From Swiss-Prot:
The chain crosses the membrane at residues 11-31, 51-71, 78-98, 101-121, 134-154, 162-182, 206-226, 245-265, 273-293, 298-318, 332-352, 361-381. PROSITE patterns: MFS. One of its GO terms (cellular component) is plasma membrane. It is found in: Cell inner membrane. Keywords: Cell inner membrane, Cell membrane, Membrane, Transmembrane, Transmembrane helix. This is Protein TsgA. Coiled coil: none annotated. It is a multi-pass membrane protein. It comes from Salmonella dublin (strain CT_02021853). Belongs to the major facilitator superfamily. TsgA family.
Length: 393
């Protein structure tokens, strides 16, 4: 593979995470405007975003098989057509049913693209490079989470319709579409060469279950928290711009945290530092919820930084539970995390309708506490120390 081809594929991976990050994170910023557009209460409107998350979950789950049947380049190009149709549906329809369908299609497209992006990084890089590249790729999710809430706040403050936010997100997929030209993708399934000997199967162990629960609770807690921060902040009397700044601050420090921890983690036992980070994140989230308005930006900045390495560390630890890294095992943990994404508004919507946004934030805080317990329990059963003695974390 040529170096320019590798660079193009790596950028497709980076942008695939940015696309999903933008779609998922911008929800909290535009939800109130979309609710007004359809004349619905915010808590009812949040349920329709479950279609976005369901699309992401279904596509990540199915793409484990789809990647072996349909070439990756074909999937990405067809995804661009679907993206254009979905954004057009949002712009030109006033039907809630069509809005839900468009959200589902956006979820399908971003889920397929993200699973292809993850696969490309694991194929292109090995050993130490794979871990650091995966963490750097994941930082594009956060980068989009920092940029697009600011874009949304800029557009909404100027009374520009909410659907233009999704048109801006579509530009990320346009970049992916352009990169597919003159680019060779790894072949899979019937398109691949079958020269390698089969790898012996290994039992996963109970540690994988702890990590799967941690992944689900972490993503559900994180998105449940960040999706309702704008409504919570507005309820405290903050402006839309200030509420958006809190979300952007979180993802900005999350992004810097990922870059910092891609260097820091190699000096520590991964399970131990993961337990410490999960505990700190739970405490910092509690301080944000119960603290004064003046201290909220500082708490959300430190929360973003210290929670940034948790999800990628969970996935890395999962891959180290077997002697040979299992794509199915990693996909299982990713799927559990995506289930957390799908459940975000299923769980928090009724809580907000009944008890308000603060109750949703406290629920998210409880889920972070569960992540801490799972990471602590993992210390007694994890196999990563025996499997990664010569390798890096």
């Amino acid at each position: 593979m040529t170096n320019s081809n590798r660079i193009k594929l790596t950028w497709i991976s980076f942008l695939s995470y940015a696309l999903t990050g933008a779609l998922v994170i911008v929800t909290g910023m535009v939800m109130g405007n979309i609710a007004d557009y359809f004349h619905l209460p915010v808590s009812s409107m949040s349920n329709t975003f479950t279609f976005l998350n369901a699309g992401i979950l279904i596509s990540i789950f199915l793409n484990a098989w789809l990647m072996e049947i349909v070439p990756l380049k074909t999937q990405l190009r067809f995804g661009f057509i679907l993206m254009v149709l979905a954004v057009a549906g949002l712009m030109f329809s006033h039907s809630l049913a069509l809005f839900s369908a468009a959200m589902f299609v956006l979820g399908l497209v971003s889920g397929i693209t993200m699973s292809i992006g993850t696969f490309l990084i694991t194929q292109l890089y090995e050993g130490r490079q794979r871990g650091s590249r995966l963490l750097f790729t994941d930082s594009f999710f956060s980068m989009a989470g920092m940029i697009f809430p600011m874009v949304a706040a800029f557009l909404l403050a100027r009374s520009i319709e909410w659907y233009w936010v999704y048109a801006c997100i579509g530009l990320v997929y346009l970049a992916i579409f352009i990169l597919t030209f003159g680019c060779e993708f790894p072949a899979l399934g019937k398109h691949a060469q079958h020269s390698q000997a089969p790898v012996a199967k290994e039992k996963w162990g109970i540690g994988v279950l702890f990590l799967a629960v941690a992944a689900l609770c972490y993503i559900l807690g994180q998105l449940g928290f960040i999706s309702w921060v704008p409504e919570y902040a507005k309820g405290l009397g903050m402006s839309l711009n200030d509420a958006g700044a809190l979300v952007s601050d979180f993802w900005m420090s999350y992004m810097f945290g990922m870059w910092a921890f891609s260097f820091i983690l190699r000096f520590f036992d991964l399970q131990r530092i993961l337990t410490v980070l999960a505990g700190m994140a739970a405490v910092l989230m509690y301080l944000f919820i119960t603290g004064t308005q003046a201290h909220m930006p500082w708490f959300i900045l430190t929360l973003g930084f210290f929670s940034s390495a948790i999800y990628t560390s969970i996935i890395t630890l999962g891959s180290q539970q077997t002697k040979v890294a299992s794509p199915k095992l990693v996909n299982f943990i990713l799927t559990c995390g995506t289930i957390g994404t799908m459940l975000t508004f299923v769980v928090t919507g009724p809580i907000v309708a009944h008890s308000g946004p603060q109750a949703a934030l406290l629920t998210a805080n409880g889920l972070y506490a569960v992540v801490f317990v799972m990471c602590f329990a993992l210390g007694f059963v994890s196999r990563h120390r025996q499997h990664s003695a010569p390798a890096t974390h």
